Regions:
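Extreme N-terminal starter segment of soluble prokaryotic enzymes
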Residues: 3-7
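Conserved SAM/SAH-binding loop
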Residues: 9-15, 276-278
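Short His-Asn-centered micro-motif
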Residues: 10, 58, 66-69, 187, ...
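Phosphate- and divalent-cation-binding pockets in alpha/beta enzyme and binding domains
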Residues: 15, 71-76, 237, 257
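Class I S-adenosyl-L-methionine
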Residues: 19-21, 26-28, 38, 84-280
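Mobile active-site "lid"/loop adjacent to the S-adenosyl-L-methionine
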Residues: 31-49, 185
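Short strand-turn motif at the edge of the Rossmann-like AdoMet-binding core
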Residues: 31-32, 68-71, 228
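Conserved Class I SAM-dependent methyltransferase catalytic core
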Residues: 43-94, 114
Length: 280
């Protein structure tokens, strides 16, 4: 097995060849899109072969999140994965374009969620609903029309409930300012990224984006995989959230960046925020 909890210098297939079958709980990756003039987009990459290896190392009840294009998602389906849903990362700033560009300003990226057809029950997939909630919204209180408690009897279409003493009670649902997570993720792009988060990588993803995926779709102690470390954001998020990880990159510069982020993340302390904790 390769070294764990450290970004290592290998290509994707070399790392995957060293991993055992069904040894990974969650895969999150943002592979080269092969659509730009950036150096890492000039490599020859067989997505069908890559995703078949992902399917081999992923546990039957594990998630695979792909940050990429529709064409890449089709390759994932062709390799044997089943699509469950997708997130839209809605950016605060559009990607720049030239006068010859023949499409609108792009303000989003797609994040496809896949699972393995070998899974006997979809309900076995990890889904931490509370971890996906957002806080700081307006509080509210609404009357529950169908609430029942043990030993109590309903009346008036369920709006009032008769307790054991024969008194009618109204029951309410209270919300302390949270909203359930949805499929539109409004998170800053690199242009507006905090200076202490930004590293020297052209397509860096925000830590908040990875935190959502890791907290929502894995548990503490699980093992996460990313075969294209890039800016090292997955390695940092996994460390902060007490997940193990395997991660690699063929570029020595990005390997060093990732490991520096891991080292710094171990020194960060938690601070209280709405509904839980965030890292300072």
């Amino acid at each position: 097995m390769p070294e764990i909890n450290k970004v290592i210098k290998k290509d994707a297939f070399e790392l995957l060849s060293e991993l055992e079958d069904k040894s990974i709980d969650l895969i999150i990756t943002d592979p080269p899109w092969l659509t730009t003039s950036l150096d890492f987009d000039k490599q020859d990459l067989n997505f069908l072969k890559l995703f078949k290896e992902y399917k081999r190392v992923l546990k039957d009840d594990g998630w695979f999140f792909l940050i990429g294009t529709v064409e890449m998602a089709c390759a994932a389906i062709q390799s044997g994965f089943k699509r469950k849903f997708e997130y839209i990362w809605y950016k605060d700033i559009s990607v720049s374009q030239t006068k010859t560009t023949i499409h609108p300003l792009l303000k989003h990226e797609l994040i496809f969620a896949f699972y393995k057809p070998e899974l006997d029950k979809v309900s076995r997939l990890t889904f931490n609903r509370k971890a996906l909630r957002t806080y700081g919204h307006k509080k509210y209180k609404i009357q529950k029309s169908s609430t029942r408690k043990s030993g109590e009897f309903g009346s008036k279409s369920g709006r009032d409930v008769l307790d054991k003493n024969g008194n009618f009670q109204n029951y309410y649902k209270e919300n302390n300012g949270y909203r359930e997570g949805n499929s539109i993720l409004k998170i800053y792009s690199k242009q507006n990224m905090p200076s202490d988060e930004r590293v020297d990588h052209p397509t860096q993803k925000p830590i908040k984006l990875l935190n959502i995926l890791i907290r929502g779709y894995s548990n503490e102690g699980d093992t996460v995989l990313d075969t294209f470390s890039g800016s090292g954001v997955l390695a940092e998020s996994a460390t902060l959230n007490k997940r193990n990880f395997y991660s690699c990159d063929i570029n020595e510069k990005y390997v060093k960046i990732g490991n520096v982020r891991v080292t710094k993340s171990k020194l960060k302390k938690k601070k209280k925020v709405f509904g839980g904790y965030e890292y300072a």
